[in-house]
Design a protein with these regions (language model features):
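Short linear motifs in intrinsically disordered/low-complexity regions
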Residues: 2-3, 17, 31, 248, ...
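N-terminal, intrinsically disordered, polar/charged segments of Gram-positive cell-envelope systems
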Residues: 1-63
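Active-site beta->alpha N-cap acidic-glycine motif
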Residues: 40-156, 245, 261
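Context-gated lysine
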Residues: 9, 19, 39, 65, ...
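Compositionally biased, intrinsically disordered low-complexity regions enriched in proline and serine
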Residues: 14-15, 29, 42, 89, ...
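Catalytic domains of cell-wall/extracellular-matrix polysaccharide-remodeling enzymes
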Residues: 125-225, 229-247, 251-252, 258-259, ...
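N-terminal start-of-chain detector that recognizes signal peptides
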Residues: 38-42, 65, 90-91, 161, ...
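Polar/charged alpha-helical tracts
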Residues: 10-18, 83, 106, 113, ...
């Protein structure tokens, strides 16, 4: 496995500035308990060797590997996205948040059943709660991991930090949380291509496609930031033409797995 350290933090800073924490809350403030037999989770050691962003730049003849990643769901748009992915026989990655309603839990199951990668994006998706302390982060993480296991039987080993691993929102050093995930055998993913659909003045579907295509041509491995929250109808509209454009350029569209080069703003192996 390879870790790609993204040297430029402009994208994550833009993401933090544009993405509201949740309705009525500032981004800067930011289940039922398990009663079953305690579970044993498979541990996967995070990759220890990294490649630079420069080494990830695509050259002539390189095949572009593109990983479509959706975060903030499930929502009423997630099913539509799954339908489109199925239509094109494309697998993606979903970094989900915690929800207890039957519809959302059915979507967790559908994501797993249809061969997509089920990742974690925190239970509450509220910065003020998640990043309040080491204990708060760990409690939030374990709550989501346990729920996904109980609902789907999947031991998720992939995580995306709300705001990314280099966010400036947390009052606790991000290295604390990275160290914890390393201990848990969990690999976290940032992104190196952004669709721009987190912005409050969201782009049109055509602009979303253009944003992605302008950047994926640069890299051997592109982890694309997309959102499947309830207000992201333009993302749904953009998905089919985006897949068609990626297919036309000869890209491989893949779900994150153990063979994926890891895109991280802060490398996991840089934390003791």
């Amino acid at each position: 496995d390879n870790i790609v350290t993204v040297s430029s933090k402009e994208q994550v800073q833009q993401e933090n500035a544009q993405k509201p924490e949740s309705a009525g809350e500032s981004v800067y403030t930011d289940v039922t308990e398990a009663t079953e037999t305690p579970k044993t989770y498979e541990s996967v050691t995070p990759p220890a060797t990294g490649i630079s962003e420069e080494e990830n730049l695509a050259g002539d003849g390189d095949i572009h590997k593109v990983y479509l990643t959706f975060e903030d769901g499930p929502s009423d748009h997630t099913g539509e996205i799954l339908d489109i992915l199925a239509q094109y026989d494309v697998k993606a990655t979903f970094f989900v948040v915690g929800k207890e309603d039957e519809e959302s839990q059915a979507l967790y199951q559908r994501i797993a059943d249809e061969g997509h990668t089920l990742g974690m994006h925190s239970y509450s998706n509220k910065y003020s709660q998640i990043y309040q302390s080491d204990e708060a982060f760990e409690e939030d993480f374990e709550r989501l991991r346990d729920e996904l296991y109980q609902v789907t039987g999947v031991n998720s080993i992939y995580y995306r930090f709300p705001g990314g691993s280099s966010n400036q929102i947390s009052n606790v050093p991000m290295s604390d949380f990275i160290h914890y995930l390393n201990e848990q055998g969990v690999i976290y993913y940032d992104w190196n291509v952004s669709a721009g659909d987190a912005a409050s003045n969201a782009y049109s579907s055509e602009e979303i496609v253009a944003n992605v295509m302008d950047d994926v041509v640069k890299y051997k491995t592109s982890v694309v930031l997309l959102h499947d929250a309830s207000d992201k109808s333009a993302t749904v509209e953009a998905l089919a033409p985006l897949i068609e454009a990626l297919n036309e350029m000869g890209a491989e569209i893949l779900p994150i797995d153990e063979d994926t080069s890891v895109i991280q703003y802060v490398k996991a192996d840089s934390i003791d």
